[in-house]
Amino acid sequence: VAAARRDFYGRLAHEAWHAYAASRLRPAAGHGLPPWLDEGLAQVLESAPLEAGELRLDAADPSRLTALQALLREGRAPPLAAVLRAGGDRFIAGHASAAEDPSHAYLVAWGLAFDLAVTQPLLAPQAVVALGQGGDGDEVARFERLVGVPLETFELQWRRRMAALRPSAAAAVSPAP
C-alpha cells in the first residue's frame, strides 16, 4: 500500500507540473516549454521527497541518478544536442525509433533539469519563459544562451557533475505522504 501511495503521489506531482507549465509558463506567442525541460522538471517534482511538509527539490532521486550515471559511464546516453532537439514524442515509449530508448532521453532530461534547477541554478522565471519562446528550431542556441557556454563545453562539465553527484539522505525519504 505504501508503494502504491508513493507511486500515486509521484504521478500526481508529475502530471500537475505538466498542467501548471501548460497554463502558466506558455508565453502568449510561445510554444510552451521545450519537451526536455517539461519532462525533466516533471520528474524532479515527481521524485522530490516530502520532508516536514515541504518538497525537497534538492534531493537527487537515487534510482534515476544511479541509472543516469550508468548510462553516462557506459556511453549509452544520448548526446545533449539530440535531447534538446527532441520533440515530445521522443519521450514516449511507443513513438521512439527502434534505435532509441525513450528512457535514456527521459533520464538525461531529468539530469539536465535537476542540474539547471538545483546543482547550477540557472532556471530563473525569465530564463524558463525565454526557453519556451522557441519554435524556431534553434533549441541548442537558446540553451547556450541560458548556460553561457557552448553546448560541447557544458556537456563535458555536466557529465562530470552528474558522475560526481551523490544522493542526499533526504532522497531516501518518501516522495509522498
Locations of regions flagged by a protein language model:
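Acidic/His/Gly-enriched intrinsically disordered linker/tail segments
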Residues: 7, 11, 29-176
